[in-house]
């Protein structure tokens, strides 16, 4: 299958993920539980990552595991800005934009210092409220960052993570 066809299928699956992974509500305790779930997976699998769960106005959870770097926290910030701007998964935008340089097209006027075209940011969509924040992971290849977030969010909201997972690249 051609790369473009693979991307189209993955984009379709990510859209299904975004439509299925709706939180009934989200508070500080929910964010801690979700963040801890991601951290537990990372520790078990020996993944060096940074994790951020934030609403638009404040951070609710942050953690880093062994192997994460200072750069990962900067990637978290830049991915958060992308979710805030577009209200969709950052990996979906990576596939839609199809740019090797991880920068948005110049006409978007988004400074690379503040916006990263990289997977791992996922919108927090609350039933009846819309997108209110983002869950972000940084430290793995971008598709793996995305898959880790989707797995944890799916488990958290009672969806089947296997049915929602992207196929291996």
Curated annotation (Swiss-Prot):
SUPFAM superfamilies: GlcG-like. InterPro entries: PduO/GlcC-like, PduO/GlcC-like_sf, YBR137W-like. Pfam families: HbpS-like. PANTHER family: PTHR28255, UPF0303 PROTEIN YBR137W. NCBIfam families: PRK02487.1-2, PRK02487.1-5. Belongs to the UPF0303 family. This is UPF0303 protein BCAN_A1444. It comes from Brucella canis (strain ATCC 23365 / NCTC 10854 / RM-666).
């Amino acid at each position: 299958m051609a790369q473009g066809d693979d991307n189209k299928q993955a984009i379709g699956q990510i859209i299904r993920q975004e439509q299925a992974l709706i939180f009934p509500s989200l508070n500080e305790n929910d964010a801690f539980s979700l963040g801890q779930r991601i951290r537990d997976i990372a520790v078990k699998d020996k993944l060096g990552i940074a994790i951020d769960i934030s609403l638009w106005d404040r951070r609710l959870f942050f953690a880093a595991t062994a192997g994460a770097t200072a750069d990962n926290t900067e990637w978290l910030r830049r991915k958060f800005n992308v979710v805030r701007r577009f209200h969709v998964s950052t990996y979906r935008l990576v596939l839609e934009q199809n740019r090797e340089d991880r920068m948005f097209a110049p006409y978007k006027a988004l400074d690379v210092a503040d916006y990263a075209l990289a997977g791992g940011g996922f919108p927090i969509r609350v039933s009846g409220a819309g997108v209110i924040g983002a869950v972000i992971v940084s430290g793995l290849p971008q598709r793996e960052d995305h898959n880790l977030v989707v797995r944890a969010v799916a488990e958290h909201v009672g969806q089947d993570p296997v049915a929602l997972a992207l196929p291996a690249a």
